[in-house]
């Protein structure tokens, strides 16, 4: 039986989450269902490099990219198209079946990575979490104990950072918000979901999964 291979990716963008104007960091981990890693890449996209220091969200990590670029820990490419081609070529070389991200409605819709679909199938890890981990009473308890609350205040937080804090039992965990680092934790979240052996959806973004048949759970804050 052929082994299923996955590509978990993450993007960091300038211009905000609603209408990003460019991707400056693209990272991915290619792996199997057990977390055995076949390849990784972290790409700094130079056409948007100068924009990092002027973006309210991105600039806090500008020093990280400067240091990693100087040390060779991150690879510089000229354009988004160059970065996309590297990711796509890796997926083709390793026979990837599913590309994945935590909220594919952003990474596979609003960035250059949208061009990976429909060539590859996809899994929205965020939707997967809502169909699995978020149904656990222990998750809601953990969120309440550590004040992990959604922006509306009506439900427990369901970000990748909070979910990873839960599965690692580390309430102090903070995402680095660099693409490869975030892709690693999203892969770990995916593997934890798989181990639950629960039904989950494929080839649909969380925001498009409407109706009771998708069995999404946003744990209520109030007990």
Feature names for model-found ranges:
Residues 2-110, 114, 161:
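Conserved non-catalytic scaffold segment of RNase H-like nuclease domains
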Residues 47-67, 131-183:
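Active-site-proximal helix-loop-helix substrate-binding element of RNase H-like nuclease domains
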Residues 69-74, 116-118, 170-175:
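Short, polar/flexible loop-turn hinges at active-site or ligand-entry regions and domain interfaces
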Residues 114, 166-170, 189-196:
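Active-site catalytic microenvironments for nucleophilic, acid-base chemistry
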Residues 118-134:
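Conserved beta-strand -> loop -> alpha-helix junction used to position metal-binding or nucleic-acid-contacting
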Residues 148, 180-223:
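Acidic two-metal-ion nuclease catalytic site recognized across multiple nuclease folds
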């Amino acid at each position: 039986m052929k082994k299923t291979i996955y590509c978990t990716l993450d993007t960091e963008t300038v211009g905000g989450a609603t209408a990003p104007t460019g991707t400056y960091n693209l990272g991915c981990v290619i792996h199997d269902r057990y977390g055995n890693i076949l390849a990784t890449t972290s790409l700094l996209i130079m056409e948007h490099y100068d924009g990092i220091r002027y973006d309210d969200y991105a600039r806090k990590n500008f020093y990280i990219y400067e240091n990693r670029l100087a040390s060779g820990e991150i690879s510089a490419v000229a354009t988004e198209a160059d970065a996309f081609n590297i990711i796509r070529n890796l997926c083709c070389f390793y026979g990837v079946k599913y590309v994945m991200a935590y909220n594919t409605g952003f990474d596979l819709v609003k960035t250059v990575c949208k061009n990976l679909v429909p060539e590859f199938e996809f899994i929205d890890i965020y939707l997967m979490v809502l169909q699995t981990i978020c149904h656990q009473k222990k998750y809601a308890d953990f969120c309440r104990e550590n004040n992990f609350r959604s922006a509306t205040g009506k439900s427990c937080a369901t970000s990748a950072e909070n979910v990873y804090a839960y599965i690692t039992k580390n309430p102090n965990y903070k995402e680095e918000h660099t693409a490869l680092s975030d892709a690693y934790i999203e892969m770990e979240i995916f593997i934890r979901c798989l181990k639950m052996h629960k039904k989950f959806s494929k080839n649909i973004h969380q925001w498009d999964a409407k109706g009771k048949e998708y069995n999404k759970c946003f744990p209520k804050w109030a007990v």
